[in-house]
Amino acid sequence: MSGGDSPAPRVLLGVSGGIAAYKAAEVVRLLVDRGASVRVLMTPAAQRFITPLTLSVLSKSPVVADLWDPASGAVDHIELARWGEVLAVAPATADVLAKMARGIGDEALSTYALAHRRAIVVAPAMNTWMWAHPATQENVRILRGR
């Protein structure tokens, strides 16, 4: 990822609450191994599948898991928006896709997504019926149009 004297890419990884959340550990490890600086944001549901501690150890940074708990490593979402060069949401549940498409910021990940002004990469992860639902497809169309 980083070559020569160029600074390490700054990646914000948003982890939402589906069974695929456990794969976030491998994503963080791969990014760090390739020279990226990684910060992780988690939804409350994601924390039911993988702990913030796991992702904090792998990313070597505090995980933002709760906007309102200073002990969770929360920082100003505007500060994070300035820091992150790319927001990668993996996995992106139907819930998080809907929040991002409709401008709902009710937890750390969705609030940050509203403040982020750079590249966003989304890796949807849900069952096929949820993916095929017209509401989900409309949310994907909205996000692609931005």
Which residues are covered by each model-predicted region?
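A cross-family phosphate/adenosyl-ligand binding-site feature
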Residues: 1-146
